[in-house]
Design a protein with these regions (language model features):
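Glycine-rich phosphate-binding loop used to anchor ATP phosphates in small-molecule kinases
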Residues: 48-111
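Pre-Walker A (Motif I) flank of P-loop NTPase domains
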Residues: 1-2
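Hydrophobic anchor at the beta1->P-loop junction of P-loop NTPases
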Residues: 5
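Short loop/turn segments at strand-loop or loop-helix junctions that form parts
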Residues: 32-33, 73-76, 82-83, 117-123
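Conserved glycine(s) of the Walker
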Residues: 12
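Conserved substrate/cofactor phosphate-moiety recognition/catalytic segment
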Residues: 15-61
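The conserved Walker
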Residues: 9
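A glycine- and Lys/Arg-enriched "phosphate-lid" helix/loop adjacent to the NTP-binding pocket
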Residues: 86-162, 179, 185-189
């Protein structure tokens, strides 16, 4: 089962992924693509988001196998939302051809995702040094993209909100429900 924890920056993704890994051993954790991009700028820009999008997509397409639980911190849809947010904010973004290619890549990668857990950024204090305008615009763009069945594929989308413990409980419940609908399921999370 492939689970993507999605949300804008500073929304609690790392915390939830860590909590899920502890609650569901031996879950395989895929870290934030930001950590895997060598030239990630201090202030991410369109080229950084595009590179992270391709990293996020490739790793989702590479993981497979029955009985495996894979939890990805941020998926390619998140990075596409950042590109859309840059447009909304009037900031430099990817050229139209690159954006179209990115959408196709997202659709292919998301086709294999079973569950998307979407975090509510309002549950985490907004850090002033984290570009609050981009944070808000990305969240709105992500919600719009999650309504596009061509991009989400067959993934179940579940909003996760509240304090840390409640988020973990909601995520575990969503994983259990999504897994029960899959043939050859991995069993309920512990």
């Amino acid at each position: 089962m492939r689970v993507v924890v999605s949300g804008t920056h500073a929304s609690g993704k790392s915390t939830l992924v860590s909590d899920l890994a502890a609650a569901c051993p031996p879950a395989e954790v895929l870290p934030d693509p930001f950590e895997l991009v060598d030239d990630a700028a201090a202030e991410p820009d369109a080229s950084t988001f595009v590179e992270q999008l391709y990293v996020a997509a490739a790793r989702l397409e590479e993981v497979s196998g029955p009985g495996r639980l894979v939890v990805a911190e941020r998926g390619p849809l998140d990075l596409l939302a950042y590109l859309d947010a840059l447009v909304e904010l009037g900031r430099p973004t990817a050229d139209p051809a690159a954006a179209d290619d990115a959408r196709e890549t997202v659709a292919r990668a998301m086709d294999g995702v079973d569950l998307v857990l979407v975090l509510d950024p309002d549950d985490v204090p907004e850090p002033e040094d984290e570009d609050p305008d981009l944070r808000a615009a990305m969240h709105e763009a992500l919600l719009a993209l999650l309504d596009d069945p061509d991009l989400v594929g067959g993934a179940t989308v579940v909003d996760v909100a509240g304090p840390r413990r409640s988020r973990l409980e909601q995520a575990l419940r969503a994983i259990g429900e999504a897994d029960s609908r899959r043939p050859g399921n991995v069993g309920p999370p512990t």
